[in-house]
Amino acid sequence: MGKITFYEDRGFQGRCYECSSDHVNLQSYFSRCNSIRVDSGCWMIYERPNYSGYQYYLRRGEYPDYQDWMGFNDSIKSCRIIPYSGSHKMRLYEREDYKGQMMELTDDCSCVQDRFHLNEIHSLNVLDGCWILYEMPNYRGRQFLLRPGEYRRYLDWGAMNAKVGSLRRVIDVY
């Protein structure tokens, strides 16, 4: 089980809300979020209710300012704990509906372009474990949580285009 604490003000100040499970709508607990402390587990926090809007991946640690989790603003309206899996495996496809060249991945990939000579992935199948997809290399840019399942096109994981820069396994190493 995980534990995350949201604070309205920077530096862990102001009204706070402690959470240990998924929340589809956090609006009644705080109006803004400027700092977060993750005591245990890995979490995905979302800019809007219903797990929508910008997504941010957080591991155990302290985030005294929303820019520390690469946030664009102080709006956090839903959160989800990410289940831990000991093994990770996914298949990436260069075209929609699992067509074109297929590549298999079992570890982190800091640059999809360097490793597979592609910068667009149009479909993927997560066979084991949870992953974070980043639109830019070196784990930067917009983030998307990938849970086990099929993603026939980039819209299925919430992206506006097929640009994939890097991929990271969700591992709670602490």
UniProtKB/Swiss-Prot annotation:
Region of interest (Connecting peptide), ranges: 84-87
Write the record's keywords in alphabetical order, separated by commas. Answer: Eye lens protein, Repeat, Sensory transduction
Signal peptide per UniProt = none
For this protein, the record's SUPFAM superfamilies field holds: gamma-Crystallin-like
Keyword check for Transmembrane helix: no
Its name, as the record gives it, is Gamma-crystallin D
Keyword Cell membrane (UniProt): no
Q: What is known of its domains?
A: Has a two-domain beta-structure, folded into four very similar Greek key motifs.
Q: Which organism is it from?
A: Macropus fuliginosus
**One Gene Ontology biological process:** lens development in camera-type eye
Molecular functions (GO terms): structural constituent of eye lens
Subunit note:
Monomer.
PROSITE patterns referenced in this protein's UniProt entry, alphabetically = CRYSTALLIN_BETA_GAMMA
Q: Which Pfam families match?
A: Crystall
Q: Which domain of life is it from?
A: Eukaryota
Q: Which family does it belong to?
A: Belongs to the beta/gamma-crystallin family.
Which parts of the sequence belong to the Beta/gamma crystallin 'Greek key' domain?
Answer: 2-40, 41-83, 88-128, 129-171
Function description? Crystallins are the dominant structural components of the vertebrate eye lens.
